[in-house]
Amino acid sequence: MKRSRLVPQHIFSIISKRYLAKHAYQKTLNLPKTKFPNRSNLEITLRELIPKSSQLVYKEQLRDFFEEFSKLNTTDEKLEFIKEKLFILHDGPPYANGELHLGHALNKILKDIINRYQLSQGKYIFYKPGWDCHGLPIEIKALKDLSAQQIESISPLKIRSMALKHAQKAIKRQRETFQHFAILTDWETPYLTMDKDYEINQLNIFKEMYERGLIKRQNKPVYWGTETRTALAEGELEYNENHKSIAAYVKFPLEKKSQMDLCKKLGITNNLPIYCLIWTSTPWTLLSNRAICFNQDFSYSLLRLNSELILVETGSIDKLGLTTNSFETIKQFQGTHLNGLYYQNLLVDDKVGRPLLHGAHVTSGTGTGLVHTAPGHGQDDYLIGIQNGLEIYSPVDHQGRYQLNELPQSVRSIVRDEGDLTKGRQVLDAETAKIILCKLSDLNLLYKSHEYTHSYPYDWRSKKPVIIRATPQWFADLHDVKNLALESISRVKFCPKRGYSRLSSFMKSRNEWCISRQRSWGIPILSFYKKSEPDSVLMNSEILAHAIEKIKQKGINAWFNDKDNDMKEWLPEKYHDVAHEYCRSQDTMDVWFDSGSSWSVIKDFYEKSLKLSKLPSPLYQVCLEGSDQHRGWFQSSLLTKVASSNVPVAPYEEVITHGFTLDENGLKMSKSVGNTISPEAIIRGDENLGLPALGVDGLRYLIAQSNFTTDIVAGPTVMKHVGEALKKVRLTFRYLLSNLQKSQDFNLLPIEQLRRVDQYTLYKINELLETTREHYQKYNFSKVLITLQYHLNNELSAFYFDISKDILYSNQISSLARRQVQTTLVHILNAYRAILAPILPVMVQEVWKYIPEGWLQGQEHIDINPMRGKWPFLDSNTEIVTSFENFELKILKQFQEEFKRLSLEEGVTKTTHSHVTIFTKHHLPFSSDELCDILQSSAVDILQMDDNNNSLPTIELGSGINVQILVERSKRHNCPRCWKANSAEEDKLCDRCKEAVDHLMS
């Protein structure tokens, strides 16, 4: 016969007291029970929980959006619906190269938290992840196994094919890792900057900018990467504050006629040679010198040094290291006297007089007030050159070597590469500077040289110093565009607010954007060069439109096919007679132009998917990227948008920036330092790094708990704290689930039918919901978790959970008090679901897997889908809450003080062994049983206060009501079931427990 689950009452009399105490009634208690595991299972997380909480939810809600949208008729209705119900956070595309690092996880998870919060607020989410697919790093990686000779001979089409495969592989790997982060999106339909539609959109943006007169080709100085062999934009530079150069003070002699003219202007007689003393930190550019600039507002001095005269700005004399007796000031004069003078550059010995020119850029901070000017190697120099008709001369090739055939014969021998006599020396080689300075010294033109530590631009890809070199490049004119851009961002919100200053300062300093690159893996600039005159370029709106249409038909690779020499196909019919004279340009666009055109993805969504003829403005609500993107993607998307539309409206409504990831020593994580931590190491754990396995939610918790607007720290110590915090949350969910399994009635009671302590607890839950919602709206995710942890520790663990256990475990399963507690627990569970779903979607999804279905069926307050459930609001009776704070909580506080006394005096260690008597002359708004539950005593009596209780502490409860409290050891026996000292006889059940057991037996 099968043994009965319950032990008959008469059997207890023959069982030992010890066994009775520990085991006899255990099966009659409603002990917590759930299959919700103590730890997450990564295999189940990846296979089941992430798809269910992420991709499936995203697709479902987007289908619902389209269904609702399809019911609307007018454009105004549709735009209003989009404004009210659609939330778009546009994904700045990560680069399709290499493995993902913690910074990628930081970026994607922050975006996901925002999207999931918006989903909880009843919004529909459109979030399309993207990848930035073109550019030099991918091209270099694709060609890394080839020799330099092979690379020189390989065709652009082959390079593109190899780069494409590399990008595709990188995207596949990165996508697989991104999917482990539980991101709310559809990974099957990302946007790629190498997609055909994307490329056509980008070419059309270029065409619109060209039609507005913003695109121009000029031979002017640009930053040039000698390692990567391409022009660079300002955004592709990083500055080394400790770069060391060899700087020099160099003398340039005035021509004889200019010497005479100056002496005449100054009213002096002189037979000594006069030299202009310049200072430079780039001696290699002296071969390209075309002028010396001065500032006509400065005071200059003519100094006698031994048997020669030196011209310098008066305030610079102290920098020359001269002793008082070593020089004589012949004359001080205004800079205007230098107008019209000429000097010679004896280093190149070309007998050509070079002018002294006024330049407002000349300052007295460094140097001598006389500035060596090489229009082919500097921005200010270039402007002076254009204004004065100087040659834009740059005898340096794409490898950063002197071009010997471009140099005068007199200097070719000294800058010839000794290892290869057909080539010039590398201009940045320290030995090159020494050779030039040695030559200057031989010519008696070197005053002195010294090592100079200063800030210098480096190529952010190769980490090598760049040069400034004049080459024919395509530029976007930003003089007017930046004013539109600045006007537009004055209406953009920034988080943190300092982002506005950073972005606007970068914008103000830009007058142009070099958009051409000399690489094969990119979007082509659709221009044509005359074969016989490479500087003669053919481009207009008609040609651009024709070429774009041809690319639509043949694909973009056709442009790079060097076997396709039929130019008639690429040019409109009216150019067919001369088409054979032209060839297609091989220049490609800056990759920042690529990613900066990504707002067209959102534009396509409106126009192609939603069939809208009128678009929302701005196009999307939020973009979120690292703080380095103020000079990158935030700027390029802003520029392309306002430049192509000619309207001062940014594509985004709000810009959010995050910091970088640091190790526990505060060092920025980098491969070169060897202190990086991969997201997978955090998810799976890494013994070598001392990292515990935190799972997907642990990675997300780590990111959410940080103040992401500054740099975030990650390492073993931080991970340990995250693991402990995550465990607390998980155990809280486990407690809730385990006490919701047993119930005869899964219907929630109305809040007004709950006990006062339950209503107070739900009021605190509502406060928590409101506070955390405010934090979410301000992107203070760390404060969300801090607030929740405080509530968990102080309101739940230390109070409500503690006082509810006796009712949950010992009361009849169908008792009103137990139903009241369970109703409260369901509301707590649902509130924690709402608060944590944006941060810990996997855990929340897992919780819902184990919640009894009865609590989910037909309930107004709780949704069957935890990711799409509403943000709860619990309507509290504030009068009851205030009364509870004034009555029960004040009594509880005094009880705790009195119990400490009882414990010290009589050794009572458990409140369940105490008896409480409340004396009062007033009616109290609670029952003795309710107060007993809160105090967790064995029993509470409420008696009439008399004058004999003066020795008892009096508690002022407000409104003239006061009570006295007596706490003493209970005179009754411990109940062997609930352990309260409330039984009339030893080893006998208390009345409450006897009724519960009898109910089970019936």
Swiss-Prot record:
It is found in: Mitochondrion matrix. Its EC number is 6.1.1.5. It catalyses: tRNA(Ile) + L-isoleucine + ATP = L-isoleucyl-tRNA(Ile) + AMP + diphosphate. GO terms for molecular function: aminoacyl-tRNA deacylase activity; ATP binding; isoleucine-tRNA ligase activity; tRNA binding. ATP binds at K671. It holds the Pfam family tRNA-synt_1. A motif ('KMSKS' region) lies at residues 668-672. One of its GO terms (cellular component) is mitochondrion. Keywords: Aminoacyl-tRNA synthetase, ATP-binding, Ligase, Mitochondrion, Nucleotide-binding, Protein biosynthesis. A motif ('HIGH' region) lies at residues 94-104. CDD domains: Anticodon_Ia_Ile_BEm (cd07960), IleRS_core (cd00818). Its main location: mitochondrion. GO terms for biological process: isoleucyl-tRNA aminoacylation; mitochondrial translation. Belongs to the class-I aminoacyl-tRNA synthetase family. Present with 1270 molecules/cell in log phase SD medium. This is Isoleucine--tRNA ligase, mitochondrial. It comes from Saccharomyces cerevisiae (strain ATCC 204508 / S288c). The lineage of its organism: Eukaryota, Fungi, Dikarya, Ascomycota, Saccharomycotina.
